[in-house]
Amino acid sequence: MKIVADENMPYVEALFADLGEVVMVDGRTLTQAQVKDADVLLVRSVTKVNKSLLDGCDRLSFVGSATIGMDHLDLDYLKQRGIFCTNAPGCNAVAVGEYAFNAMLELARRFHNPLKGKTVGIVGAGNTGTALQKCLEAYGVKTLLNDPLLEQSGDEREFVSLDELIERCDVISLHVPLTRDGEHPTHYLFDKRRLNALAEDTWLLNCCRGEVIDNRALIEVKQQRSDLKLVLDVWEGEPLPMPELVPLVEVATPHIAGYSLEGKARGTFMLYQALMAQLGRAVDKSLASLLPPLWSHQLSPLSVPDEKALLCLVRLVYDLRDDDELFRQRFQNNKGFDLMRKNHKHRREFSALMLANTAGSDVDWLLELGFSGVGL
């Protein structure tokens, strides 16, 4: 079996080498000749998989993309050819959820306004929104969900309207895809009217797509309302954010909320699982075994007395302030936004930090938050 894979996908050799010959290629410049005798093709979103690439590739039976979306795959053509295709939905969901939770703790610390006791509204209850909800519920924070599409699909969770969520919530975090059509378009979902409707001292976080918020309107509203606190990981007009918006934002990063080492590795691992299922073989490797340890030792926390202590624990895994500072220094440089993303040192997720003897203790809720427990 010949496996052709994008050279920027991690752990391909470790996961797939036992199955056959692995050839790593540049996904941006991949040619038909490189794929011609492949049985398996593993790509990222930079590779367009269509007839022009695969015509004449008679051996190919499996295409996997280590991405959330599939818009770079010609699904009709692959179906016509009988080529199995899959992707990695939700591979970065934990990273995005933890980023948003982390940002809330940073705001709470900076403005002496505790997260505990607030009501957090999550707009978009798919993979990333649900990951955030898991963090918040582990910490004992009340959440409200808005997702009309999931509500209509029969999702049994309780949902509220967007206007009700805006009225009732102290914190609002956005986790929707960008859509311009249909019954519930999300383009400029938060326009000037909705931004003006935000309650006093609201925290607004956007970790999905920049154009879900009208950034020009956001500038106007924020200039009049210093009470609003903003966390933006995504920007209208990326990779060129509106320069007058950045100084108005409390936490600013270059679309890296989903950039964790675990998330990147999870994308590759999900394709490995799918291929093993197609081959009718048992999965004999684990994601955890691939990842390097965060530290060589473990922590044994006896208590987490307040949010300051919790934030200190979170910062041991990822200090959001570093990315915020770098973004402010470089976002106006030519290609600075893209270079920050390309050269980003993928952070770790909470699970990388091992906590000893926490089960049944006063801090066992940290396991629900996502930290790993040993000596249970």
Curated annotation (Swiss-Prot):
InterPro entries: D-isomer_2_OHA_DH_cat_dom (IPR006139), D-isomer_DH_CS (IPR029753), D-isomer_DH_NAD-bd (IPR006140), Erythronate-4-P_DHase (IPR020921), Erythronate-4-P_DHase_dimer (IPR024531), NAD(P)-bd_dom_sf (IPR036291), PdxB_dimer_sf (IPR038251). NAD(+) binds at D147, D233, G258. Pathway: Cofactor biosynthesis; pyridoxine 5'-phosphate biosynthesis; pyridoxine 5'-phosphate from D-erythrose 4-phosphate: step 2/5. GO terms for cellular component: cytosol. The active site is at R209, E238, H255. It is an enzyme of class 1 (oxidoreductase). SUPFAM superfamilies: Formate/glycerate dehydrogenase catalytic domain-like, NAD(P)-binding Rossmann-fold domains. GO terms for biological process: 'de novo' pyridoxal 5'-phosphate biosynthetic process; pyridoxine biosynthetic process. It catalyses: 4-phospho-D-erythronate + NAD(+) = (R)-3-hydroxy-2-oxo-4-phosphooxybutanoate + NADH + H(+). Belongs to the D-isomer specific 2-hydroxyacid dehydrogenase family. PdxB subfamily. Homodimer. This is Erythronate-4-phosphate dehydrogenase. It comes from Shewanella loihica (strain ATCC BAA-1088 / PV-4). The gene is pdxB.
